[in-house]
Amino acid sequence: MKYLAAYALISLSGKTPSKADVEAVLKAAGVPVDSSRVEELLSEVEGKDFDALCAEGKAKLVGGVTAGGAAPSGGAAAHAAAASAPAAAAAEAEEEDDDDMGFGLFD
């Protein structure tokens, strides 16, 4: 995903991304670069317009959501456990808030 993000950033700047450009963006962000993955990305998108790639990706996302069908249910026990988890988290958060009422920043 980071390789695609670098490609998108360069494309949106108006340039045609090259291997050196993508690697430079990734290195500037402090990301370790695998040159073979950059080459693979560039070969996959070669000759394609960035806007067309975005439209193609959107179509796949929308199509995947409607074609997937319903997810299997875990039953009533899973729903009960999921419902009790937020209540426990809220109670724990309230306990943590009480500790900060002394305003002792560097105690």
UniProtKB/Swiss-Prot annotation:
Post-translational modification: Phosphorylated.
Gene3D superfamilies in alphabetical order: 1.10.10.1410
Residue segments, region Disordered: 86-107
UniProt GO MF annotations: structural constituent of ribosome
Acidic residues bias (residue ranges): 92-101
The keyword tRNA-binding is annotated on this UniProt entry: no
Gene Ontology biological process terms, A to Z: cytoplasmic translational elongation
GO annotation, cellular component aspect: cytosolic large ribosomal subunit
Keywords: Phosphoprotein, Ribonucleoprotein, Ribosomal protein
Similarity annotation: Belongs to the eukaryotic ribosomal protein P1/P2 family.
Matching PANTHER family: 60S ACIDIC RIBOSOMAL PROTEIN FAMILY MEMBER, ACIDIC RIBOSOMAL PROTEIN P2, PUTATIVE-RELATED
Subunit annotation: P1 and P2 exist as dimers at the large ribosomal subunit.
Function comment: Plays an important role in the elongation step of protein synthesis.
HAMAP family: Ribosomal_L12_arch
Name of the protein in question: Large ribosomal subunit protein P2
Classification lineage: Eukaryota, Discoba, Euglenozoa, Kinetoplastea, Metakinetoplastina
